[in-house]
């Protein structure tokens, strides 16, 4: 299927669009992560970015993509509440890989938010959803518009949570192609790739964290816990960036 034809999927009706996406997802399911990235870089619209939380295993997708497209814009949504170790990790990886880092934030500072709304993360699921909307969803939507993004690479995986185990490799959200190259990778495959390529993990990994977000809504992984229970007090897994 040609690049020209794929770019025009958005002009088709829902049924035809879904049929083509099903065919492409079947194709991508037989590819390796590297082949998926190469295919996407060649066939999907060329205003391309990747997003990264610079979390525990984020180095994997960064490494896979920048080998093929070193100057790809890397979008970071900074809530102002990341761990100090995360900010240091961002600086370290940006310098090491010469990342084309693009940082976006809420138009309301974290201090002003607390003055206006209080500690939203302590106000149940509604407070968390509102917090995520103004600190993550709105800045990401601004970033996608500001950079005129047509194709979005992200590092989601099926085994990360129940909410992610049915995700497709390729989807279209608000007219933007979203590709998940390591969707079928297991934790063991992630660990093997990190070791084989001598890549760095987040500093908090060795302190018992399996997932890292904001300081106030991230817990260490304890025996018997699911990974998704380490975030948002177990009330939810997604921060809103990857929800429909």
From Swiss-Prot:
Keywords: Cytoplasm, Oxidoreductase. It comes from the Bacteria. InterPro entries: PAPS/APS_Rdtase, PAPS_reduct_dom, PAPS_reductase_CysH, Rossmann-like_a/b/a_fold. It is an enzyme of class 1 (oxidoreductase). SUPFAM superfamilies: Adenine nucleotide alpha hydrolases-like (SSF52402). One of its GO terms (molecular function) is phosphoadenylyl-sulfate reductase (thioredoxin) activity. GO terms for cellular component: cytoplasm. The active site is at 239 (nucleophile). The keyword Signal does not apply. Its EC number is 1.8.4.8. Belongs to the PAPS reductase family. CysH subfamily. This is Phosphoadenosine 5'-phosphosulfate reductase. It comes from Buchnera aphidicola subsp. Acyrthosiphon pisum (strain APS). The gene is cysH.
């Amino acid at each position: 299927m040609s690049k020209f034809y794929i770019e025009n999927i958005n002009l088709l009706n829902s049924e035809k669009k879904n049929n083509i996406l099903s065919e492409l997802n079947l194709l991508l399911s037989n590819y390796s992560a590297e082949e998926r990235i190469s295919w996407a870089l060649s066939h999907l619209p060329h205003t391309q970015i990747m997003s990264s939380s610079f979390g525990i295993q984020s180095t994997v997708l960064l490494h896979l993509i920048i080998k093929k497209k070193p100057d790809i814009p890397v979008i970071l949504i900074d809530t102002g509440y990341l761990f100090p170790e995360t900010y240091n990790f961002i600086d370290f990886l940006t310098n090491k890989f010469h990342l084309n880092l693009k940082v976006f934030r809420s138009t309301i500072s974290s201090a002003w938010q607390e003055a206006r709304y209080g500690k939203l993360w302590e106000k149940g699921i509604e407070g968390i959803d509102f917090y995520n909307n103004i600190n993550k969803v709105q800045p990401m939507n601004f970033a996608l518009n500001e950079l005129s993004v047509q194709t979005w690479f992200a590092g989601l995986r099926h085994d990360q949570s129940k909410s992610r185990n049915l995700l497709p490799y390729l989807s279209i959200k608000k007219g933007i192609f979203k590709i998940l190259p390591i969707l079928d990778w297991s934790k063991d495959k992630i660990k093997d790739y990190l070791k084989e390529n001598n890549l760095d993990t987040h500093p908090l990994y060795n302190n018992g964290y399996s997932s890292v977000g904001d300081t106030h809504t991230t817990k260490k992984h304890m025996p018997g816990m699911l990974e998704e229970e380490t975030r948002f007090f177990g009330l939810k897994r997604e921060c809103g960036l990857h929800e429909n």
